[in-house]
Amino acid sequence: MFANVDEAISWITSRTRSAHQASDFRQYVQSLGNPQLKLKCLHVAGTNGKGSTTNYLRSILQKAGYKVGSFTSPHLMTHLDRIRINDENISADYFLKIINEKQQEWESHDLTMFEIDTLISIYYFLDQQVDYAVYEVGLGGRLDPTNIIMPIGAVITNIEMDHMNILGNTIRQIAREKAGIIKDGLTFATFEKKRAAIEVFNMAAKVHKAKMIRTHQARNVKISDHIEFDYQSYHVSLPTIAPYQILNASAAIALLRALKREKKLQISKADILQGLQTSWAVRFEQVSEKPRVIIDGAHNENGIDELCHALAQIPEEKVIVFSALKDKRYRQMLEKLQGQGELIITEFASKRSTTAENLAEGLEGVTVIDDWNEAIDEALRRNKTVIITGSLYFISLVRERFLKQ
């Protein structure tokens, strides 16, 4: 028995590895009676944009008057923000209660943190009687714990080279893992364009008699202090200057329009346009005005490419603070960032992180500061726009620092 939620979180976060297979978790959930099948779910997979797309879907459904659960990772401020209903985290009391009730059972089945989080979200959403639940895939798709759900619709954002040690070394291999969320009769949207990935999606759609919707190109894009664009019959406004959000918003529109046509939900054009007025933390998020500080969770090459595209909208000089996990292609990420402004390389405490010295090896003209707080302090003294990026785990620490100020 845990006395408080901090003890419960400490226990759950210690359960990072397991010897069992994904099929063992599925069998365990079947022994519970498959409670997840009582939920109406949307599923979001892909290399980049999963969190933003999940947030757009949640916000639009919420504007339509629905009670909406969302499951995302990693957390931004507290472990509890992985599981939310509308704009509220799961209650600490419920989280503590269910872990105290189920701890021994979950330990006996050797469940991992992500499997436990998935189960808690299902129990919580059922208890609170949500109308819809939007699930973001943690990693891949086929073997991900969230793949126990039977969604009414899905988005597979894009396919890029990331997590190759787990998902495969080619676009086709990675696409197969992501396409593992495609179920019989599923309607899913994607903005992926690479031929190898689309061939995989087409094959999966044929096998499962699923319907793939490929998003259209946005038209009349204008970027000032926000973004405006036309998508089909919609004139969309987004409260960001990050162009990559156009793709995520378009995927959300495409899926929800299709589900409306299939009479799987009721939603209006106004609901969609108003729902897209939301913003997603750590995605080109400004956390300070003077000096201007922007944090972005780009954590792979494609994410950095999209960040660089967004940085082109900022004319003033920039200083970039960077850290990354050791299993990422950080050298390629840093090479892309070198032309964007002065680089300060740092490190943060994580089992998966690496030293600032390792990150900076072989690079010229960069500043190395081991302590990430000191690195940010140094960047703030430069009297330039400060950009902080490289890892979602790093950015969550940075965000907490600025929100406490």
Where are these regions (language model features)?
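Short functional linear segments
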Residues: 1-46, 53-66, 71
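ATP-dependent carboxylate-amine ligase catalytic core
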Residues: 29-37, 63-149, 167, 195
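Short Gly/Thr/Asp-enriched flexible loops that form oxyanion-binding sites at enzyme active sites
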Residues: 57, 142-152, 399-402
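Acidic, Mg2+-coordinating active-site environments of NTP-dependent enzymes
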Residues: 129-136, 153-235, 249-269
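A glycine-rich beta-strand to alpha-helix segment
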Residues: 375-403
